[in-house]
């Protein structure tokens, strides 16, 4: 059997969806599947990517109502709210990070964010503790290691002054 030529309708390249088109596709999916946690979370991340923080916060809130214990969601959600509050992690972002810390006190990402919250509250000793623990848990080759090392160095320099 020799393979036949592909029909001309399948021969054309499929153009990837733009981020805006993807967002609309996700929204359409959620109309039929409003309890789809993963899609709400993905929609929130896509909305952050295009700078639509208010809508992303709403999407993350919907995901949170479905699964309030997903650590990645808690961090994404807190980051979106903080970005909407000019980088401030006080209030709800802090509550979400504290919840994530209670769920997984060994998570490097959670420890990093907990350090940010502590630093925003001028609790430099606590920020240092969180970041040192994150570094201890993190492999030397981890690509984000330098970010935490720089944050820790900043704290140490502030404590010396």
What are these regions (language model features)?
Residues 25-28, 62, 99, 133:
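The canonical alpha-helical register within tetratricopeptide repeats
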Residues 100, 104-122, 126-134:
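Soluble extracytoplasmic domains of inner/organellar membrane proteins
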């Amino acid at each position: 059997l020799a393979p036949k030529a592909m029909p001309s309708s399948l021969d054309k390249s499929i153009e990837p969806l733009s981020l805006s088109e993807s967002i609309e596709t996700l929204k359409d999916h959620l109309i039929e599947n409003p309890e789809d946690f993963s899609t709400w979370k993905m929609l929130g991340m896509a909305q952050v990517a295009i700078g639509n923080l208010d809508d992303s916060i709403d999407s993350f809130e919907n995901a949170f109502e479905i699964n309030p214990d997903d650590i990645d969601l808690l961090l994404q959600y807190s980051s979106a709210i903080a970005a909407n509050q000019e980088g401030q992690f006080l209030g709800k972002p802090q509550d979400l990070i504290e919840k994530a810390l209670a769920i997984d006190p060994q998570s490097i990402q959670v420890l990093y964010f907990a350090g940010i919250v502590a630093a925003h509250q001028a609790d430099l000793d606590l920020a240092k503790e969180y970041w040192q623990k994150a570094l201890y848990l993190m492999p030397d080759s981890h690509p984000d290691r330098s970010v935490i090392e720089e944050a820790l160095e900043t704290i140490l320099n502030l404590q010396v002054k």
